[in-house]
């Protein structure tokens, strides 16, 4: 897996102050994507054990609320496989931090057997995520007044509550 950028102290992509990882590789190719350079799976730098340790150190301070995954597309199968061991580490070493993920795929698509991007690690990866912003960016539905999303078709899903209830539960700003 490759990544295009890491932002420390990001306040735009999730609740509170966050560390944001922009993974590389995306087959969605949304019109007017704000990161089209990350569509290439080999854009940026390889995601290594050293990268993981650097991210864990950035996440450690008490003022950092958590980690946000963007792209590219974190839920491309190869990215899911690359992210899963790292998210396990985050949960093990920093259990109080929240994990947000943005995806151009819908919750329903991620749960449809046989569909791209569902793979053998999708369920476990989702179980490690607190909040999922799902759905493609749609230029015609772009609305700058929306918090944490670019277009009105996108949802901010409370993953633990959704998994426990069996129905989509939207995240509510605390």
Language-model regions, residue ranges each:
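Conserved Radical SAM active-site core
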Residues: 1-4, 17, 32-115, 120, ...
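N-terminal pre-triad scaffold of radical SAM enzymes
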Residues: 2-29
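Residues at the C-termini of beta-strands that transition into short coil/loop
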Residues: 7, 103, 136, 160
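Short glycine-rich, flexible loops that bind phosphorylated cofactors or substrates
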Residues: 76, 140-141
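P-loop/Walker A phosphate-binding loop and immediately adjacent motor/lid segment at beta-alpha junctions
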Residues: 86-91, 142-174
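Short, conserved loop/helix-junction motifs that constitute active-site signature segments
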Residues: 124-127, 150
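Receiver (REC) domain switch/active-site residues of two-component response regulators
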Residues: 130
């Amino acid at each position: 897996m490759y990544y295009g950028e890491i932002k420390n102290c990001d306040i735009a992509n999730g609740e509170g102050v966050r560390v944001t990882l922009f993974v590389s590789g995306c087959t969605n190719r949304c019109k007017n994507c704000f990161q089209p350079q990350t569509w290439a799976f080999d854009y940026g730098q390889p995601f290594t054990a050293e990268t993981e340790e650097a991210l864990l150190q950035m996440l450690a301070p008490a003022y950092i609320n958590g980690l946000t995954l963007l792209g590219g597309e974190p839920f491309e199968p190869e990215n899911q496989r690359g992210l899963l061991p790292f998210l396990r580490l985050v949960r093990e070493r920093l259990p109080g931090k929240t994990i947000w993920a943005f995806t151009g795929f819908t919750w329903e698509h991620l749960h449809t057997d046989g569909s791209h991007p569902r793979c053998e690690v999708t369920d476990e990866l989702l179980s490690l995520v607190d909040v999922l912003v799902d759905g493609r960016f749609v230029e015609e539905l772009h609305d700058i007044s929306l918090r944490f999303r670019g277009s009105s078709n996108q949802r901010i899903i409370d993953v633990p509550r959704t998994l426990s209830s069996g129905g989509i539960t939207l995240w509510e700003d605390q």
